[in-house]
UniProtKB/Swiss-Prot annotation:
GO terms for cellular component: periplasmic space. GO terms for molecular function: copper ion binding; electron transfer activity. Keywords: Copper, Electron transport, Metal-binding, Periplasm, Signal, Transport. This is Amicyanin. The keyword Transport applies. Residues 1-26 form the signal peptide. PROSITE patterns: COPPER_BLUE. Its cofactor is Cu cation. Pathway: One-carbon metabolism; methylamine degradation. Cu cation binds at residues 79, 118, 121, 124. InterPro entries: Amicyanin, Amicyanin/Pseudoazurin, Amicyanin_Para/Methyl, BlueCu_1, BlueCu_1_BS, Copper_blue_Plastocyanin, Cupredoxin, ET_Amicyanin.
Amino acid sequence: MISATKIRSCLAACVLAAFGATGALADKATIPSESPFAAAEVADGAIVVDIAKMKYETPELHVKVGDTVTWINREAMPHNVHFVAGVLGEAALKGPMMKKEQAYSLTFTEAGTYDYHCTPHPFMRGKVVVE
């Protein structure tokens, strides 16, 4: 008789093989600044995702390889950008908490689809599609 543990292990291996586990986002993006910075420092024409009313205002964003995306928190509640990877949703990159009118940027260096959420508010979800 096959144990439940062996069945679960085999199932997990099959799922990972079928969908492929992605590497850490740190290998696919660069972080211009580890810390949040003032929203006033964001250049005109920048690709921006505003965070307001407990949501990412642009829940799905399409950009090109090499583009920098900046998230700006427009409300008093602190938020962050927490990317996940793989079919099990393991952490790939967790941005810092941003206070009101603070920003955080990532430059995407590899094509792919990158799902993210706010750590303290997991119902806040977004996606960056890099083409």
